[in-house]
């Protein structure tokens, strides 16, 4: 079918650019936003420069030259290769070799955390943030209070920054409970140990967890370098023991 309307060439579309020339805040606001949301990244600044040239230049061909110039700068910048690596790495992380696609996923409806320090609190937030109730266990009641207070401060900071509403904070923070007894996490589907790096301490914890939580629960350790096989061997369910090292701060860093 024939189209009755025609579309002008891009080089002839200058109404928006001309209108923006009188607004000094457009570019400054864009730079401020990029500095806040794309800290340290090179390309966003060059993209903004392209827009700035499009607004202020009268010669379309000169604008195209500027765009090509800025593109080459991005192309040779070391960040390019790193950003490409991150892009494909994030997608590859969800694909595990030799694990069939039809492998069923475990249903995680409740989680437990051992330790209420920086890592324990951050990991608890990871679960709460996706709607999974989580119970933190610590042998020291004062540490528990400090840990929960730190979590609450983190959420309040997010509210202050506009990253979540006060209602969302109340609902999410409400998913986090705490206590002093391993019996309180007997029904969790996964429990993550997040105490300091001491193998003897972790072995003691895993022996207690093996007795306390249900038989099909996953026992995980946040250890960064200790032998996970040694932790597995001290339990009656070695096939259910895994290492899950969260990068700190766990509630912010995406790397696991």
Residue ranges of model-derived segments:
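Intrinsically disordered, low-complexity segments enriched in small/flexible residues
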Residues: 1-107
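Rossmann-fold NAD(P)-binding glycine/threonine-rich loop
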Residues: 201-256
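Short glycine-/small-residue-rich Rossmann-like dinucleotide-binding loops
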Residues: 195-196, 224
